[in-house]
Amino acid sequence: MTSYENHQALHGLTLGKSTDYRDVYDASLLQPVPRSLNRDPLGLRADALPFHGADIWTMYELSWLNRNGLPQVAIGQVEINATSVNLVESKSFKLYLNSFNQTQFESLEAVRETLERDLRACAQGDVSVTLRRLEDVEGEPVARFSGDCIDNQDINITDYEFDAALLSGAAGEETVEETLVSHLLKSNCLITHQPDWGSVQIHYRGPKICREKLLRYLVSFRHHNEFHEQCVERIFNDITRFCQPEQLSVYARYTRRGGLDINPWRSNGDFTPATGRLARQ
């Protein structure tokens, strides 16, 4: 259990509770979660964050009505800057998107502007929204994370409780720049404890990281309860603390739930995330 799992800021969330689905636009359905909940225990201050980054959401189930009442569909991408005061709780995001279903909008741009305005208000920070028609997306190939996959190691694991100390002694003598990938990241929703499945890409320059120790550390998230964004910041913080790289970027792409996938990245260098969906997305 995290130190803030029962924090009062989480008590009012619809997540984990029976809710009615509304199909008429309602911005009040969006619910914020303060980023400070997990940052404070990690010693991360909003005015001195050791990283920059964003939470990239893909919206696969977005529909509304045009002025003639004809349903419209699009696929959207949302980028919420990591400097925002809040992250957006995912079930509330899903309920909010459902409220577009029977609402008329003048145009695709009107939908985009509405999404951007409401999400900025909820996150209290910079948000950008891009919408694409299906014909602009069809035929795009499934992407893959570049880098060396560390998953096929012949090691025994019997403990699946989170332990940052598994990274202790992981930094070697040799200085390298490399990209490591694992598809074995699995954590659990902070509230419902439903499993969240993800792939993670770690690019760094600095003391060479022991791949066995890194894999054991990533697998230890298996029983850990935290939101996607919080897990990525924890990974960034722990690798920084134990391995002290000169430069570090951590990027995770999670499988979708409720028509949404969440793909957070954090970096202290020059990093541009590839946004193509992976095989499990």
UniProtKB/Swiss-Prot annotation:
Q: Identify the domain of life.
A: Bacteria
Q: Which residues bind NADPH?
A: 90-91, 257-258
Q: Where in the cell is it found?
A: Cytoplasm
Which pathway does this polypeptide act in? Answer: tRNA modification; tRNA-queuosine biosynthesis
Which residues participate in substrate binding?
88-90, 228-229
Catalytic positions are 189 (thioimide intermediate), 196 (proton donor)
Described function? Catalyzes the NADPH-dependent reduction of 7-cyano-7-deazaguanine (preQ0) to 7-aminomethyl-7-deazaguanine (preQ1).
Q: What is annotated about its quaternary structure and interactions?
A: Homodimer.
What is the official name of this protein in its record? NADPH-dependent 7-cyano-7-deazaguanine reductase
Instruction: Give the species.
Output: Cronobacter sakazakii (strain ATCC BAA-894) (Enterobacter sakazakii)
* Gene that specifies this protein: queF
